[in-house]
Amino acid sequence: MDKLRLEVERWLNHPNVNWELKQQIKELNESEIQELFSLEKPLFGTAGVRNKMAPGYHGMNVFSYAYLTQGYVKYIESINEPKRQLRFLVARDTRKNGGLFLETVCDVITSMGHLAYVFDDNQPVSTPLVSHVIFKYGFSGGINITASHNPKDDNGFKVYDHTGAQLLDTQTNQLLSDLPCVTSMLDLELQPNPKFVHTLDNEKVYKNYFRELKKVLVINNNNFKDIKVVFSGLNGTSVCLMQRFLKYLGYSNIISVEEQNWFDENFENAPNLNPEYKDTWILAQKYAKKNNAKLIIMADPDADRFAIAELNNNQWHYFSGNETGAITAYYKLNHKVFKSPYIVSTFVSTYLVNKIAKRYGAFVHRTNVGFKYIGQAINELSQTNELVVGFEEAIGLITSDKLNREKDAYQAAALLLEIARHCKEQNITLLDFYKRILSEFGEYFNLTISHPFKATATDWKEEIKALFNQLINANLTEVAGFKVVKVHLDKQTNILEFGFENGWVKFRFSGTEPKLKFYFDLTNGTREALEKQAKKIYKFFVNLLKLNKA
């Protein structure tokens, strides 16, 4: 019997594993067993550890949460004074088992002699609010039980330092290296102390947060606050709080997508939880049509991602993260006086903001992919500079360094609706506003494509290295008829860039699954010509790497 089968048998016969998990184990197929019972330690991705709720060392279950929490607390202990009692915030989103996993995390924290703070009544909490409370209320760190916009059967484990910023790779690698082998998670003995668990005053936290959020506004007037706006929280943490916040700001015509604006752990009326995809908007568009509304705003289930769509000439335009980042930067730099302004974005996000920043005396700081890098960059830069916006090509942004260190749907809603009202005053649309930016700085075309490939090697990461080497060693001087002026592999970020005379395509592989991501940033041409160029380049590389056989 191989090692994995022995581990399966161990789980099936272990007294700490309940009947429900044992039944789930019996229903697993071979590939699921390989994934869930691997003896490797879990991997932290761009936003924590995420996987489906399932048995095994890599499923999200009470054992894996206890194991990861133990490692996290030990890491935070190591960077604090010895024997100091630490304070941790523990929160969860609206997903299944959130309450159970939260209780498990608190049990580990209190067993280790520290204090755990939770929201009253086990209330689901938005990710930006978690970061805010850690940042503002003096916590040693925090654990967020969330899988953000992942499929409904997933859950996750997200960890923060005392500033409310996510831990970086070097820190999570240290966390994992100090943990024993994964097989130990079944035998972890806990002695929880309920006296070490404290509840927060939810109302007090919300009201303080709203007051702080209001400060992100640039021009705080009441013009057009009766603007019709359809809102969906996709059955997540913002379903009540966002509407309450917008009313606090004075908006009087917020139209709620009722089926998607209540806590539903099954997400029955929200089949897709990622606002980046158009099918996520179908129900909200029906509400917009019924109420003759031309704006829809949406937050993903943990309310870090924020998206906005606008009806133009009977067609919906879904603003990308690149577009809202550029719009926010341009608007704020035009209407606010800054001392040493800066923008933070990732290496794969649009360089249009570099041109905007240059005109207004701002600088752009680039980071690796993932908002954890943006959050930590803000920690460093905010000491002597003033944030304009932090954003990435995946929807979502932060507009203030005084609130938190996460993408924040509430900040984004406040500012982008202000900009939408400003456009209404000018008798233009939000899309017109973006086009004016392009008319000043030149057309930019951005596109992100995630392409799966069929891995044949046992270790698909080795196959990834081979593909990258193939691209580098091809010594390409042109791609699909376009001259190559640069080929560069950044060894810190593992992002491979092919530069052209009018922009670039960058490649990045997922750290957790065999997928290759293409990021395009092209300029100097009409939108149609740039889109055509991107498609030609994409097709060339798909054929070169034989990805069409995926």
UniProtKB/Swiss-Prot annotation:
<dbReference type="GO" id="GO:0004615">
    <property type="term" value="F:phosphomannomutase activity"/>
</dbReference>
<feature type="binding site" description="via phosphate group">
    <location>
        <position position="148"/>
    </location>
    <ligand>
        <name>Mg(2+)</name>
    </ligand>
</feature>
<feature type="binding site">
    <location>
        <position position="302"/>
    </location>
    <ligand>
        <name>Mg(2+)</name>
    </ligand>
</feature>
<dbReference type="InterPro" id="IPR005844">
    <property type="entry name" value="A-D-PHexomutase_a/b/a-I"/>
</dbReference>
<keyword id="KW-0460">Magnesium</keyword>
<dbReference type="InterPro" id="IPR016066">
    <property type="entry name" value="A-D-PHexomutase_CS"/>
</dbReference>
<feature type="binding site">
    <location>
        <position position="304"/>
    </location>
    <ligand>
        <name>Mg(2+)</name>
    </ligand>
</feature>
<dbReference type="InterPro" id="IPR005846">
    <property type="entry name" value="A-D-PHexomutase_a/b/a-III"/>
</dbReference>
<dbReference type="Pfam" id="PF02880">
    <property type="entry name" value="PGM_PMM_III"/>
</dbReference>
<dbReference type="GO" id="GO:0005975">
    <property type="term" value="P:carbohydrate metabolic process"/>
</dbReference>
<dbReference type="Pfam" id="PF02878">
    <property type="entry name" value="PGM_PMM_I"/>
</dbReference>
<dbReference type="InterPro" id="IPR036900">
    <property type="entry name" value="A-D-PHexomutase_C_sf"/>
</dbReference>
<dbReference type="InterPro" id="IPR005841">
    <property type="entry name" value="Alpha-D-phosphohexomutase_SF"/>
</dbReference>
<keyword id="KW-0597">Phosphoprotein</keyword>
<dbReference type="InterPro" id="IPR016055">
    <property type="entry name" value="A-D-PHexomutase_a/b/a-I/II/III"/>
</dbReference>
<dbReference type="Pfam" id="PF02879">
    <property type="entry name" value="PGM_PMM_II"/>
</dbReference>
<dbReference type="GO" id="GO:0000287">
    <property type="term" value="F:magnesium ion binding"/>
</dbReference>
<comment type="similarity">
    <text>Belongs to the phosphohexose mutase family.</text>
</comment>
<dbReference type="Pfam" id="PF00408">
    <property type="entry name" value="PGM_PMM_IV"/>
</dbReference>
<feature type="binding site">
    <location>
        <position position="300"/>
    </location>
    <ligand>
        <name>Mg(2+)</name>
    </ligand>
</feature>
<dbReference type="GO" id="GO:0006166">
    <property type="term" value="P:purine ribonucleoside salvage"/>
</dbReference>
<feature type="active site" description="Phosphoserine intermediate">
    <location>
        <position position="148"/>
    </location>
</feature>
<dbReference type="InterPro" id="IPR005843">
    <property type="entry name" value="A-D-PHexomutase_C"/>
</dbReference>
<keyword id="KW-0413">Isomerase</keyword>
<protein>
    <recommendedName>
        <fullName>Phosphomannomutase</fullName>
        <ecNumber>5.4.2.8</ecNumber>
    </recommendedName>
</protein>
<dbReference type="GO" id="GO:0008973">
    <property type="term" value="F:phosphopentomutase activity"/>
</dbReference>
<keyword id="KW-0479">Metal-binding</keyword>
<dbReference type="InterPro" id="IPR005845">
    <property type="entry name" value="A-D-PHexomutase_a/b/a-II"/>
</dbReference>
